[in-house]
């Protein structure tokens, strides 16, 4: 099991849409990563510099490849992923 610290700049005008998709459960049911992505984004924190930060569980190489293609690259820019040991 691998955990990653994710930092990314949210696209401000799309945050409401992302919140709606999270609240509707649409993201949670995405296979195979939906539960982990939902949990990570629900618990993300917005730092004073405008960067969102959260922890994500993932098994892919490269990390978060499926999540990026389906969700993250639509709603965030400058995504940085660091493995947590």
Which residues are covered by each model-predicted region?
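Short S/T/G/P-rich N-terminal loop/turn motif that feeds into the first structured element of a domain
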Residues: 1-52, 57-69
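Conserved short beta-strand edge segments in small beta-sheet-based binding/regulatory domains
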Residues: 77-85
